[in-house]
């Protein structure tokens, strides 16, 4: 299955994970990390790095559920270390990622600590490129927080063969 995400510069990006059947349109209009209300969409955070860049986090987000229905965030939380994720952009560039950690929870109640933690994961603009999937988790508390936690899954660019192609990226 695939997830399709649309970027203002590179329309038609497809994200696939062969171990699960998923298919959604993407949304990258917001400059804030807010999942699309449309459950058929997964959002790419427009201020994050593009997939396969030399550095920074490439961030995608989805609701875990919305209006009583499950969304793609409910799939994010099932990912496990070693699961493959492949991204193909509209130009045919293919990026291979491997999940590097089981999902972990960032509690949002202490905003100072939360901000520090997100700068090391979600908002990271240096270090090697990683794919970061973000959804909500924990108890629903309402208000500005919604859920008490964010659930984070990160994936690193996969090693490639010795063909000279940038690691994790096909020509």
Short names for language-model regions:
Residues 1-171:
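Solvent-exposed, non-transmembrane regions of membrane-associated and secreted proteins
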């Amino acid at each position: 299955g695939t997830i399709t995400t649309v970027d203002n510069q590179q329309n038609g990006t497809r994200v696939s994970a062969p171990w699960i059947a998923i298919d959604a349109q993407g949304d990258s209009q917001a400059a804030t990390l807010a999942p699309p209300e449309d459950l058929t969409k997964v959002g790419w955070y427009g201020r994050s790095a593009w997939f396969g860049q030399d550095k920074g986090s490439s961030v995608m987000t989805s609701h875990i559920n919305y209006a009583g229905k499950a969304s793609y965030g409910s799939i994010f939380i099932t990912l496990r270390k070693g699961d493959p994720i492949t991204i193909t952009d509209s130009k045919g560039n293919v990026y291979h990622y491997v999940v590097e950690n089981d999902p972990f929870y960032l509690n949002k109640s202490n905003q100072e600590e939360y901000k520090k933690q997100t700068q090391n994961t979600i908002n990271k603009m240096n270090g090697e490129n990683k794919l970061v999937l973000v959804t909500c988790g924990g108890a629903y508390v309402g208000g500005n927080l919604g859920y008490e936690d964010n659930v984070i899954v990160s994936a690193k660019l996969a090693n490639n063969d010795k063909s000279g192609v940038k690691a994790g990226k096909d020509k």
